[in-house]
Amino acid sequence: MADAATIAKLEEGFKKLEAATDCKSLLKKYLSKSIFDSLKAKKTGLGATLLDVIQSGVENLDSGVGIYAPDAEAYSLFAPLFDPIIEDYHKGFKQTDKHPNKDFGDVNQFVNVDPDGKFVISTRVRCGRSLEGYPFNPCLTEAQYKEMEEKVSSTLSGLEGELKGTYYPLAGMTKEVQQKLIDDHFLFKEGDRFLQAANACRYWPVGRGIYHNDNKTFLVWCNEEDHLRIISMQMGGDLGQVYRRLVSAVNDIEKRVPFSHHDRLGFLTFCPTNLGTTIRASVHIKLPKLAANREKLEEVAARYSLQVRGTRGEHTEAEGGVYDISNKRRMGLTEFQAVKEMQDGILELIKIEKEMA
């Protein structure tokens, strides 16, 4: 049972949400009085309550989603709130649906989408993973952060070949190393106000760190938003090479540390928007002609379930007609399908851009 002080805070938060008529978050849309009353006293085995789930969305009324999972059990215990939000965000992933088993598919189906190097500046594929037996950020103790970092860094130090590299802990990092990682755009900063409000940044920078290979084409973030963010990237448009590198890394790491997986939701992450495959495959791409015809760009993007962002990610402008374009769907399809849909969409965009001469 949640304690009286927590329930009082929840009641206050619920009132604030109800009064916020201009709030458009999915939390506001789906947290009815009856759902609220049925969940407000519940507590997971690790001590997480509904307050941990909704506090970021209560504090930041301009949130798009507004909820996070404090631990794996939260997805089941607070399912009456999570499930409709997941269905709404992951268009059509119904509450009766089951995410398919992991399937990276035939990795040789992926190609260089821009062999002439005229359009695609860089290509990146990332996925998120959580370590089994540990809660997500808000419930982690300082000792657990240290223990996880130890596990992750020793696991990564066993990687070989192209993936071989170095782990840099954020705690006690020298100014030189810090600057080098900033110059490479590898360093992540302490979380934004949405993550801060979700208590995702406690004991910062304890237990946080960055691993990268010598070629700087493979990167792992430890305890940023998720326990692990595994990233494969390089200049140019060779999606095949980027995808194959990611797959071999994930398979290798998985042999050494068990990941949190849910029968219905797939791989578990802190934010429900990343569930399922957890995969985001993206390119930085120059499309000057389509940039001048946003309607056409959006139409093709919608057809292939692509998300179009500005050059520097969410909420930014496209500088010089350069967009960050990625797959939108992460749930209810396999890893292979998610990346294949993105590849097909990018090939189509390049074809249209060429034809618009």
UniProtKB/Swiss-Prot annotation:
Stable at pH 4.0-8.0. Stable at 30-44 degrees Celsius. Forms aggregates above 44 degrees Celsius. Keywords: Allergen, ATP-binding, Glycoprotein, Kinase, Nucleotide-binding, Transferase. It is an enzyme of class 2 (transferase). CDD domains: arginine_kinase_like (cd07932). Pfam families: ATP-gua_Ptrans, ATP-gua_PtransN. Belongs to the ATP:guanido phosphotransferase family. Catalyzes the reversible transfer of high energy ATP gamma-phosphate group to L-arginine. This is Arginine kinase Pro c 2.0101.
